[in-house]
Design a protein with these regions (language model features):
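Flexible phosphate-sensing "switch/lid" loops adjacent to ATP/NTP-binding sites
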Residues: 1-76, 80, 84-87, 139-159, ...
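Bulky hydrophobic/aromatic packing residues
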Residues: 79, 93-95, 105, 164
């Protein structure tokens, strides 16, 4: 664990923009989260705001309130939101300067780097704190090109993909990793986004900050490193998906199957979402789940189960979609946030047996 942390949300904690904050509130091995800064939900428990489950993480209106209530500044202040284009908004920049002035190191997952802001860097140097831009790419000489070494990895790979972005793929992947471990399956998770790193996953890379020529190689390197460095070695390696195979604003997922060697897929879907996120004005509709499963099969992977995101649905509506899809597809369909993913463990166990025999 790196230390204690305060998560800054710029008044967006109760929105989908705060998925980094949501992930850290749900669980992280990298930080001990002491609080969230978010004006609209101040005074409440962050877990209760997120999903109704109290986690003992208070929400403060300001950084000043947080430091005063906690008695001392946490070690880190984390940007907990995603912005349009990954830009550092004036509000977030001001909050980072305030956090630095209070004595906190800052952690930023946006595409715009705090370390390249002269005023922010000078302020951090003066206060003796650090700036971590999680999405800042490694030097080209340190990046890896795909070599085929992943083909020698003995643990089957299972990718958690989605029919769109911002569906909860990472959360489902973590839930599944934990459920497998509880059931005695040695499972590891390869992160592919900034939140996965912030949650403390040991192996992975930030996919959208790597030049395209090296994405497959960085994925392979993470998988091979996980296989070689784990003791005992994993029985299953989960791969966190990004975006969706057919999202025109940023298609992703085929790398996990073709370059990562994933022969199994868990497919996350939001039944109430008709169009790709942010593209409704262009009438760019999300393909049906059955059609997506057929495409996944063309890539050479088998969809083991479907997991559902409940956005904009009542409990009754979500259950109805669950029953309908299970009947149409003939595979398990589960609601991770509502019922967990333990029902998928037998399916995963059979997948491991089948792939190990193969």
């Amino acid at each position: 664990m790196d230390g204690t942390a305060l998560i800054v949300c710029d008044d967006l904690f109760a929105t989908d923009n705060a998925k980094t904050a949501h992930g850290l509130v749900r669980g992280t091995e990298r930080y001990r989260v002491l609080g969230v800064v978010d004006g609209p939900t101040a005074g409440r428990d962050a877990g209760e705001v997120l999903d109704g489950k109290r986690r003992g993480i208070p929400v403060f209106a300001t950084i000043r309130d947080a430091v005063g209530s906690l008695g001392a500044p946490p070690d880190f202040c984390v940007v907990g939101v995603a912005t349009s284009g990954g830009r550092l908004t004036p509000g977030l920049r001001a909050l980072m300067l305030e956090a630095i002035d209070a004595g906190m190191s800052v952690v930023n997952g946006l595409h715009e780097f705090l370390s390249e802001d002269a005023e922010v860097s000078a302020s951090a140097a003066r206060r003796g704190v650090t700036i971590r831009d999680v999405r800042k790419p490694a030097p080209r000489r340190e990046l890896h090109f795909w070599s085929g070494e992943v083909l020698s990895v003995g643990a089957p790979r299972l990718a958690v993909l989605g029919t769109d972005c911002a569906l909860g793929k990472r959360t489902t992947a973590r839930f599944l990793r934990d459920a497998c471990r509880e059931a005695g399956i040695r499972a590891e998770l390869i992160f592919t986004g900034q939140t996965g790193w912030m949650q403390g996953a040991r192996w992975g890379f930030i996919l959208d900050s790597v030049p395209n020529d090296f994405v497959s190689g960085e994925l392979e390197h993470a998988i091979v490193s996980c296989w070689k460095e784990s003791d005992p070695r994993p029985e299953l390696i989960l791969l966190e998906g990004q975006s969706a195979l057919r999202n025109p604003s940023g298609p992703c997922g085929s790398e996990l199957i073709l370059s990562g060697g994933a022969k199994g897929v868990i497919l996350q879907h939001a039944p109430a979402r008709a169009c790709f996120e942010g593209l409704a004005a262009l009438d760019l509709e999300i393909p049906s789940v059955a059609d997506e499963i057929a495409l996944i099969a063309m890539y050479g992977a088998r969809t083991l189960a479907v997991t559902l995101n409940s956005e904009h649905l009542s409990a009754e509506q979500l259950s109805a979609h669950q029953r309908r899809l299970a009947g149409e597809l003939g595979i398990p369909v589960v609601r991770p946030l509502e019922e967990g993913v333990e029902a998928l463990v037998p399916v995963v166990r059979e997948f491991i047996r089948a792939e190990t025999r193969a």
